[in-house]
């Protein structure tokens, strides 16, 4: 099983295919397993896929202070540093990023910090700004504890994070912290520093974020493109995988990647 050690913690990763690299960044409840219906199509199109479980997710170790880390200002810069280290370990020169929801925040932060590493970035269902604290927003949008979730999502979380951790992880992740933080969230100040082609791929009926978030992302980057998936819920990769693959592929082709 491919693990590498980053900051003293075992981080799980997978690499598939050859060609230009695409790094897939999972969302705030996810791990590499969520990409199972997405990555093979990109391998078939001649790309190399890199995906990994960020610290504390999936099969990666969380460390003794994970809760404090998750709720701290360290989360975003350390998530960037983790990807930079993985890039060194795998000896990849530059790559495309596809970030789902919170993964898009990690991707944008990375593209701002290391512009010469990033050929393009796609963000899907990523929040651009909040009008209330994340604690307030999440209490409104995700009121149900793990035991009150539907069986399908419970089983998925157990598959992703293990039977021992799924409930405590979900109940932690649904409060506040992670890439969206604990207070009022706003990506707009950093977006003008993203210099590569940027695709904003958004659903028209996310239970979390409205399409005005997509427009704000699109308006604030210098090389933005905007695609809205009609009749699609928050988890775009899961609800409309064929469209997800098609739109990202044509974006990459349009920029000669």
Language-model regions, residue ranges each:
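Catalytic active-site module of serine/aspartate enzymes centered on a nucleophile-bearing elbow/loop
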Residues: 231-257
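Conserved HGGG/HGGXW glycine-rich cap/lid loop of the alpha/beta-hydrolase fold
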Residues: 9-65
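Flexible "cap/lid" loop of the alpha/beta hydrolase fold
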Residues: 105-113, 119-151
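Catalytic histidine neighborhood in serine/cysteine hydrolases
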Residues: 218-235
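Acidic catalytic loop of the alpha/beta-hydrolase fold
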Residues: 205-209
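Active-site loop/oxyanion-hole signature of alpha/beta-hydrolase fold enzymes
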Residues: 44, 51-98, 246
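Active-site nucleophile elbow and catalytic-triad environment of alpha/beta-hydrolase enzymes
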Residues: 175-190
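Short beta-strand/loop motif that positions the catalytic acidic residue
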Residues: 194, 200-202
């Amino acid at each position: 099983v491919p693990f590498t050690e980053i900051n003293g913690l075992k981080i799980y990763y997978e690499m598939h295919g050859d060609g230009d690299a695409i790094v897939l960044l999972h969302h705030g409840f996810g791990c590499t397993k969520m990409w199972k219906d997405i990555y093979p199509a990109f391998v078939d199109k001649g790309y190399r896929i890199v995906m990994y479980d960020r610290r504390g997710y999936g099969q990666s170790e969380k460390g003794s202070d994970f809760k404090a880390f998750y709720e701290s200002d360290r989360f975003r810069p350390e998530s960037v540093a983790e990807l930079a280290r993985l890039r060194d370990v795998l000896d990849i020169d530059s790559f495309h990023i596809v970030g789902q929801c919170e993964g898009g925040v990690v991707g944008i932060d990375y593209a701002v910090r290391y512009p010469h590493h990033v050929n393009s970035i796609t963000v899907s269902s990523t929040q651009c700004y909040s009008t209330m604290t994340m604690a307030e927003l999440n209490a409104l949008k995700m009121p149900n504890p793990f035991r009150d979730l539907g069986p399908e999502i419970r089983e998925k979380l157990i598959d992703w994070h293990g039977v021992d951790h799924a409930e405590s992880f979900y109940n932690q992740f649904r409060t506040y912290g992670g890439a969206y933080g604990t207070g009022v969230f706003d990506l707009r100040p950093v977006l003008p520093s993203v210099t590569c082609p940027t695709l904003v791929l958004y659903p028209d009926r996310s239970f979390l974020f409205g399409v005005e978030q997509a427009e704000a992302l699109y308006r604030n980057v210098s090389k933005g493109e905007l695609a809205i998936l009609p009749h699609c819920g928050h988890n775009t990769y899961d609800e409309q995988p064929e469209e997800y693959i098609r739109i990202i592929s044509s974006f990459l082709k349009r920029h000669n990647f």
